[in-house]
């Protein structure tokens, strides 16, 4: 599933290429995404000009004069851009697949600048929701989210004040979108390794110095990933069809039985399952 850095990369790419463009028409090949696309979807977006593109957590938001379009990529959703006159650009690829199957191209947005924005989703867990309001505060999907991890609000004091009496391990807490929004399995694994914290450590047992480390390293790993173009494990591509490269810098994620990357550590990377998710940690330096 694309996480915060991947959605941020897509947002920046889209902003450069399609912001201020007008949607000429919308073609829908398959309405059956996570939430069925309504019959009024194309009509509501035709002739609307994109005034801004923003991100909150793992959601992408297209802003129009009096409307909003909320997008979530689910497990395998991708947005691609092609030039209307050059269909060859369309032949991009998945990370582990040389062919992007056009049967999974579900929505085509034809734009006034000669570009076509395509939504491709193999598993169809992603969705688009249209709102007749320009106010983000009216979007129910966003109202219950915790602060953005890269924001000033997500700091040591916030962390300390919001873990009191919580009977959760640190891995599950960081995955809770009501506590902090946008984090997913990859970056939580990496941030906990960088902080020398075992993923099963109970929140109420965290010392202030450990909280400081976790807060700092969450921000660090996210910024680093954004600078590297995001992570491409299986499905993520940016809008140009290019893979991110942060996966080359993973310390623990997907590294089961590898030696710890810390030179001074003789531990091995172990894999356990926490709340149904694969979790990776060093057996020695994350105790």
Language model feature labels by segment:
Residues 65-182, 187-194, 202, 209:
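Phosphate/anion-contacting hairpin/loop surfaces
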Residues 15, 22-41, 51, 61, ...:
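Basic, nucleic-acid-binding surfaces and adjacent catalytic neighborhoods in DNA/RNA-processing proteins
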Residues 2, 6, 151, 210:
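Catalytic cores of large soluble enzymes that bind and process phosphate-bearing ligands
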Residues 1-120, 125-126, 258, 262, ...:
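A cross-family signal for N-terminal binding/gating loops and helix N-caps
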